Amino acid sequence: MVDHDSVSLDWEIADGVLRRSNNREWRSACHIHNATEKRLMQAIEILETLGDDLDLSNDLRDAAVDVYCDAFRSGVTDGRVTACVVAVALCIASRRTGHPIPMSRLTQSEQVDETKYNRCYIAVCDALDVDLQLLSPSDYLAFIRGQLSGETDDQDPAAELLDAVGEDTQFVGKDPAGVAAASVYLVEQEHTQKEVAEVVGLSTETIRQRVSDLREVADDV
């Protein structure tokens, strides 16, 4: 039986306690005593792998661990694929920090099935009372900029382009991360469509179409 209430919000398991490691070398100090701890360590290992793949900050990883532990305590993780729960935890944590990660990028991992991720996302958000507010293309600019150059700009010309086209019906039902990536490509053209597509986990053809849409709408503004 899983003891959800015994979970601590730390990083490494030593002497039966999950502790945050200051030097992040938690693997060498772990002593796994039961199935509950095994599940937690598996989750953290998956989180580290996804974090490395996405070059995520330590602060964001810590925030995702907190979300995962909250989900674990609620019992919503029971019977669900651990990798999907971890990906959802990263998504929620990134939204809370103001730098949301595109869902399409999280589900690129071989460990994360998109259909199961979507179901898990709804379940975890319901269990943790997370607001399911829709995001706009501008919300994804910080993540895209960080992935492409490691920097963000308060005076982002891509944001100005997105503000100019507003909520045009041309983009209704379109992935906002794809629209954001297309705007970055258009205003800079320092990166290829393939590069910006990879950042948001979408196809080059999708970005090419969003670029075409943006050009068409911008010409009418």
What are these regions (language model features)?
Residues 1-221:
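Non-catalytic, interaction-prone regions of core transcription and DNA-replication machinery
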